[in-house]
Amino acid sequence: MSAEKLYIEKELSWLSFNERVLQEAADKTVPLIERIRFLGIFSNNLDEFYKVRFADVKRRILINQERGGSDNSKRLLSKMQAKALKLNEQFDELYSELIREMARRRIFLVNEHQLDEAQEKWITKYFRKEVMPHITPLLMKDEIDVLQFLKDEYAYIAVELRKEDHSQYALIEIPTDHLPRFVMVPEQKGKRRKTIILLDNIIRYCLDELFKGFFDYDELAGYAMKMTRDAEYDLRNEIEYSLLEQMSAGVNQRLTAMPVRFVYEREMPQEMLDFLCSKLRISNYDNLIPGGRYHNFKDFIAFPNVGREYLENKPMPPMKCADFEGYANSFEAIKAKDILLYYPYHTFDHIGELVRQASFDPKVLSIKINIYRVAKDSRLMNSLIDAVHNGKNVTVVVELQARFDEEANIEWSKVLTEAGVHVIFGAPGLKIHSKLLMISRREGDDIIRYAHIGTGNFHEKTARIYTDFSLLTADQEITNEVRNVFGYIENPYRPVKFNHLMVSPRNSRTQIYRLIDNEIANAKAGKKAGLTIKVNNLVDKGIVTRLYAASNAGVKINMIIRGMCALVPGIEGVSENIRIISIVDRFLEHPRVVITHNDGDPQVYISSADWMTRNIDHRIEVAAPVRDPRLKQRIIDITNIHFTDTVKARLIDKEMSNSYVPRGNRKKVRSQVAIYDYLKNIEKQTRRQKSDVSDT
């Protein structure tokens, strides 16, 4: 069978994932405002797709043209464009449907032509007081390099000022850095209706306010537009510049990078479109996408609560983990037994509290942590600064190349360094994506180490919407190896061996192959064999080939893949023993988990790494075995609950059809809700057991 039929192109698979996001916006069982927010998530995802994946394929085409290579990338780009345009059409239809549905609920998202007299007066007053001070039109004269001034991923209104048969053009940036995109328009007392207008439409209504007295025109019209730039940048790798300086320069390259997408309002006159393409140096019409009158739909992620609870998801407040209760501090709790947290079902506050306690605990000697993405106003980061002030030795490994978080991480690096934190940036050429924390504490004559190994970032905000595991342990074999990982980050050329952890790029590939090969050997020996895998992305061809071999040997493989999946399940003689589902629901599924049957003695690993070549071979990633039988079973149970989902699970197949898992005569199970109930029950049982012990 040809390689083309054995591997799905990752870019097309990614678009298929975003189609699943769009399915949530189309799902009438999802509360109305959540459906609108899913449109925002879809749009945000698509923006990133063009900045990264689309731009990457375009670069490959240029390289192939220079080298005289094949045109496979051209064919792929054509498929990507066709799929993206089809999804955009579905998006536009859905948006119109949701606007009508909101109107039926007495919620009106109005444009500048739908205002009554009282609203017009209020809008004009709001514009003059709040909006106009933040607007300076950019006149597109011949000598102005518009491309230099246009910001990536910002929404603009292109304005035509027409006098008889002559037109002038100007650009207005919609100032969402200073003002809300959605503005609630006051209603008359007693009216139950809610009226919302976009900032874009306030500006459109008041265009005359901006230009009158300065320009002579007969007609004035505005059209929405947005440009997406290539997100790639080159590091100078010059010895006289620090990595921090190189990264700052690299991020600045994005400000002037070439456009990879130009989205414009369909009603824009052709003459104006041609003028803009000329000014933006867009010659390839593959980059042009006609759209509606609103761009930067990602802002719809924050669509306002209109005061009607039934239009949003029912609250699922994060719960406290009972394993911490009954102890003087977090260290005693972790030392008593390993603790597993699962966000957002558990509160991330436990991690913030652990670091806060470490920052002033007189027994704590040092704290080491590696940061990939972190909240802007992170309590955890401030605790690290407090720790330095309290005389602790604090080391923070900051990944400066965390995509789209580079600027935030550069800023945090400066703040931490100024506070006296030892900030390091890791190994050249190896992005650090592991989620490690190690606290060393003097207890009597011993130094005891406490470690956190996670699947997600130390990010208070994303921990409310991403599902992720955190393992907290004082197991000496594990914590010693975590210590060695930090040593490896600081000195990647020093020989180091890991017997328990999987650490990319040292041993992850060989260990993953070993786990798969063990199941193959068991299957061939007539023993029960199985693999359960949960990752965000599976695109590494070496691992895919190994999984095909396992399927051929009779190993039953169940997978949950949220995003890109290159493996094609259900091919006779190749992958008929492989079943893949994807869950898209209110929380973003983010953990990486590997469970092997191991002839009845399951092995369970949690990991920071997706099964992509970059994560296995070109990044520092860490997977840890879960040794406590209670916690192993908990992860197995949680994973199994996903496979019972009859509401939000989609089948991954070679057609990328995104069909829902057939329910048949099974009961309705929405796995994220079922997992919340499962963990709530565990916390109740734990508290009951602790209460019984204290009563005896």
Curated annotation (Swiss-Prot):
InterPro entries associated with the record: PLipase_D/transphosphatidylase, PP_kinase, PP_kinase_C_1, PP_kinase_middle, PP_kinase_middle_dom_sf, PPK_C_dom2, PPK_N_dom, PPK_N_dom_sf
Main enzyme class: transferase
Active site residues according to the UniProt entry: 433
Organism superkingdom: Bacteria
GO MF annotation, one: polyphosphate kinase activity
EC nos: 2.7.4.1
The keyword Metal-binding appears for this protein: yes
Alphabetically ordered keywords of this record: ATP-binding, Kinase, Magnesium, Metal-binding, Nucleotide-binding, Phosphoprotein, Transferase
Coiled coil: none
UniProt modification remark: An intermediate of this reaction is the autophosphorylated ppk in which a phosphate is covalently linked to a histidine residue through a N-P bond.
Swiss-Prot/TrEMBL GO biological process terms: polyphosphate biosynthetic process
Cited HAMAP family: Polyphosphate_kinase
Function in brief: Catalyzes the reversible transfer of the terminal phosphate of ATP to form a long-chain polyphosphate (polyP).
Name the UniProt record assigns to this protein: Polyphosphate kinase
